[in-house]
Every structure is written in structure tokens, then in C-alpha cells.
């Protein structure tokens, strides 16, 4: 996982591999510490290369979303893989994250 700032000031968190009990603490910490330290206008979580996500991964994304709302940061999930999109759809979270009901059309969500 890497974090970088775009020229427009948005923070991008690139996540790769699996989001499960073994890896989710690092994501949660990256999201929360970056939100509180940087207070970016937008945080983009790029999920292009996430191959698996369980309920712990979903929980970390929800935690990040809620923390972003508290700081007035726009929280965007970018390019969720078909598997990740399906997990979010099954749990009823696509609307909360501003995603369409079909994979491949992520929309930014403004809290």
C-alpha cells in the first residue's frame, strides 16, 4: 500500500492484494492518520489491484468513510475490482460509497 498526493491536493491510497484480518490494520491506520494529519479535500482509495476483501476490509473502508465525513473530506473508492464491487453490493454499501450497482463505474462521494 502506498499513499501519495496528487497535484490537485487529493490524497491517493493505492491498495493491493488482500484486505482481510492480516492486512486491514495497516489500511485503517493509513486512512485515519492521513485524514487527521493532512485533512485533504479528497481522499481516493484505489482498489484496482485488490484481489480479495472480507468483512474486515469492508469495515476499514467504512471507518475511513466515517472519518472523512468528520473532517469534511470527500471519500472516493476508485476502480474496485469486480470481486470488491460485488462484496460492497451484497452488503448494501454501494450507494453509501457512491458506486453504481454495476462494477466499473465508481463515482466520487461527497459527505
Language-model-detected regions and their locations in the chain:
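STAS-like cytosolic regulatory interaction modules
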Residues: 1-51, 63-111
